[in-house]
UniProtKB/Swiss-Prot annotation:
Keyword Oxidoreductase in record: yes
GO molecular function: L-methionine:thioredoxin-disulfide S-oxidoreductase activity; peptide-methionine (S)-S-oxide reductase activity
E.C. no: 1.8.4.11
Gene3D superfamilies: Peptide methionine sulphoxide reductase MsrA
Species this chain originates from: Nitratiruptor sp. (strain SB155-2)
Protein name (record): Peptide methionine sulfoxide reductase MsrA
UniProt similarity note: Belongs to the MsrA Met sulfoxide reductase family.
List of catalytic residues: 11
Top EC category: oxidoreductase
Length: 174
């Protein structure tokens, strides 16, 4: 049995690298959701005019890890209090967003945000949006960290987030 989750929180390379290491996750696909344009390209998304968010689609086994646990990881590995940015990545395409795929996921997302809000210094600004169509990103964006670990962005941005995840969530590591 497999379920899917779609979340965005900054550059999709970061979330992809993290969720690829989670026990019970079968596949992580970088892509775009929440778009007003069909079949957007990376270049179009980067303009900030498509309403797309850079996201990852996580295919997981709910008997091994559930949706709520995935959201707890999501909120721990990015800053959900930053509006339309993560670090130096600025624009609506980098917004903190959850795209629930059904009403149950929507209710869980609302519950998790309400539960975690008091633990952050600033208010969580993560939005819950209708995903519309999920568009898979170009092939050169897939499995990015694993194929480019020495690239500057990977070393400076992704590696520290990955280390934080591995320290905080050892019980969820594959």
């Amino acid at each position: 049995m497999s379920e899917s989750a779609i979340v965005g929180g900054g550059c999709f390379w970061c979330l992809e690298a993290i969720f690829q290491r989670v026990k019970g996750v079968h596949r992580v696909t970088s892509g775009y959701a929440g778009c007003r344009r069909q079949n957007p390209t990376y270049e179009q998304v980067c303009t900030g005019t498509t309403k797309c968010a850079e996201v990852v689609k996580i295919d997981f086994d709910p008997h091994i890890i559930n949706y709520e646990e995935l959201l707890h990881i999501f909120f721990a590995v990015h800053d959900p209090t930053q509006l339309n940015r993560q670090g130096a990545d600025i624009g609506t395409q980098y917004r903190s967003v959850i795209f629930p795929l059904n009403e149950e996921q929507k209710a869980i997302a609302q519950k998790v945000i309400q539960k975690l809000n008091p633990y952050f210094e600033n208010k969580i600004v993560t939005t819950i949006e209708n995903p519309g169509t999920f568009y898979e990103a170009e092939s050169y964006h897939q499995n990015y960290y694993n194929t480019h670990p020495d690239q500057g962005y990977c070393q400076v941005v992704i590696a520290p987030k990955l280390k934080k995840f591995m320290n905080m969530f050892q019980e969820y590591l594959q």
